[in-house]
Each structure stands twice: as structure tokens, then as C-alpha cells.
């Protein structure tokens, strides 16, 4: 069961209550705090598109604490981040693993952050196949194609070669915030309130 806090705000018309995510959205903050699936991806995409429509010139802050999840759902969010006009600052708190790491790296260059105790993990996509051999072969080819595409995206955002990324993602590759900075997934390790000044 998921409990969502409610925030009460005083306005000139009286009190107004918001669920915490709606209140954060008012400040152009989107929070990705679950495993990534199609439903979550659609919610995040809708928030990004709403914020772009509201003010296409003002930054959006995407906070990430996710173990990863569906590659196709993550790619839908990735494409949206690249598509919209506002800069998207990405901030890892806790973890950005697998597809979460891809989204962390996809933020606007110079605006990708992690808190000091955050961890980042990259690896190749995983999948399972059942059924006829011909169907299994189709799914394996698609998985290999997705792996290559993910490696190309990480290469684009980190500055590492596709060959280096391919080697690194053969197994789970864990990084501290400082190591993610050295790798090129983030641009800065931040601490208390530093982001508000940027």
C-alpha cells in the first residue's frame, strides 16, 4: 500500500490541499521513485509535457530513485526528455540503476547531479523467452538490438566509446556518485541546497 502525503497551502482564498507530487509539480519537480513500467512512464511523460506547455523556457528537475525496469518504458521517457524544449536537470538520490541510470545521464549536459551517497548501476538489458525457436530467435535479436541502442545512448551522454560501454555493461557495473561523475553519467556531486542556486 502506498501512502501519499497531502500538503496544505495557505492562499488568499483560504486553504488548498495538494497531494505531495502535485505540490512538487508546481515547482517544476518531477519525482521518479519506483521501478520503471509503462504506467509510471506515461505519468512522467505527461508531467514533462505539461511543464513544457506551462513554460517552455524554464528548467524541469527530475529526481530519480529507481532500480530501473522496463527498457521500452524508459526509452519513452528518454525520448521525451530529449524532445521537449526546457532543460531537464536530473538528480539521483538513493539509486539510479539500469534504466534509471540511462535517465540520469539523459539530463541536460551540465545539469546532471547526484547526492553524495547515491549509487548508479549500468548493465545490459535482460529478458526471458519462451515458445517456439523461431519466436525466441526474434526476441533475442530484438534484445541485442536494444542493447546496442542503449550502449549508443550512454556513449552519447557520457563521452565514452560504444566499445567501452559494451565492455562495462557485460555485468552489473556499480558506481558511487564520485565514480559516476568520473564516468560522465553526471556532471556534479551536490550537497544541501546547492541545486537551488543553479
UniProtKB/Swiss-Prot annotation:
Gene Ontology BP term (one): protein quality control for misfolded or incompletely synthesized proteins
Keyword Cytoplasm applies: yes
GO cellular component annotations of the record: cytoplasm; endopeptidase Clp complex
Family designation: Belongs to the peptidase S14 family.
Keywords: Cytoplasm, Hydrolase, Protease, Serine protease
Keyword Protease: yes
Described function: Cleaves peptides in various proteins in a process that requires ATP hydrolysis. Has a chymotrypsin-like activity. Plays a major role in the degradation of misfolded proteins.
Complex and partners: Fourteen ClpP subunits assemble into 2 heptameric rings which stack back to back to give a disk-like structure with a central cavity, resembling the structure of eukaryotic proteasomes.
Enzyme active site: 98, 123
Subcellular location: Cytoplasm
Gene3D superfamilies hit by this protein: 2-enoyl-CoA Hydratase, Chain A, domain 1 (3.90.226.10)
Annotated Pfam families: CLP_protease (PF00574)
GO-annotated molecular function: ATP-dependent peptidase activity; ATPase binding; serine-type endopeptidase activity
Catalytic activity from the UniProt record: Hydrolysis of proteins to small peptides in the presence of ATP and magnesium. alpha-casein is the usual test substrate. In the absence of ATP, only oligopeptides shorter than five residues are hydrolyzed (such as succinyl-Leu-Tyr-|-NHMec, and Leu-Tyr-Leu-|-Tyr-Trp, in which cleavage of the -Tyr-|-Leu- and -Tyr-|-Trp bonds also occurs)
Main localisation: cytoplasm
Species annotation: Halothermothrix orenii (strain H 168 / OCM 544 / DSM 9562)
Stretches that traverse the bilayer: none
Catalytic activity, EC: 3.4.21.92
Class in the EC hierarchy, top level: hydrolase
Protein name: ATP-dependent Clp protease proteolytic subunit
Matching PANTHER family: ATP-DEPENDENT CLP PROTEASE PROTEOLYTIC SUBUNIT (PTHR10381:SF70)
Amino acid at each position: 500500500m502506498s501512502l501519499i502525503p497531502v500538503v496544505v497551502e495557505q492562499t488568499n482564498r483560504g486553504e488548498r490541499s495538494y497531494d505531495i507530487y502535485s505540490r512538487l509539480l508546481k515547482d517544476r519537480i518531477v519525482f521518479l521513485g519506483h521501478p520503471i513500467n509503462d504506467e509510471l512512464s506515461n505519468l512522467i511523460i505527461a508531467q514533462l509535457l505539461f511543464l513544457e506547455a506551462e513554460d517552455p523556457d524554464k528548467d524541469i528537475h527530475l529526481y530519480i530513485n529507481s532500480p530501473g525496469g522496463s527498457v521500452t518504458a524508459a526509452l519513452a521517457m528518454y525520448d521525451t526528455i530529449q524532445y521537449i524544449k526546457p532543460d531537464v536537470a536530473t538528480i539521483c538520490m538513493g539509486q539510479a540503476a539500469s534504466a534509471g541510470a540511462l535517465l540520469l545521464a539523459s539530463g541536460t549536459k551540465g545539469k546532471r547531479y547526484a547526492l553524495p551517497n547515491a549509487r548508479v548501476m549500468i548493465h545490459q538489458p535482460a529478458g526471458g523467452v519462451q515458445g517456439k525457436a523461431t519466436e525466441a530467435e526474434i526476441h533475442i535479436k530484438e534484445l541485442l538490438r536494444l542493447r546496442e541502442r542503449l550502449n549508443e545512448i550512454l556513449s552519447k551522454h557520457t563521452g565514452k566509446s560504444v566499445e567501452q560501454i559494451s565492455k562495462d555493461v557485460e555485468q552489473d557495473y556499480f558506481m558511487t556518485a564520485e565514480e559516476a561523475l568520473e564516468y560522465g553519467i553526471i556532471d556534479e556531486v551536490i550537497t544541501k541546497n546547492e541545486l537551488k542556486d543553479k
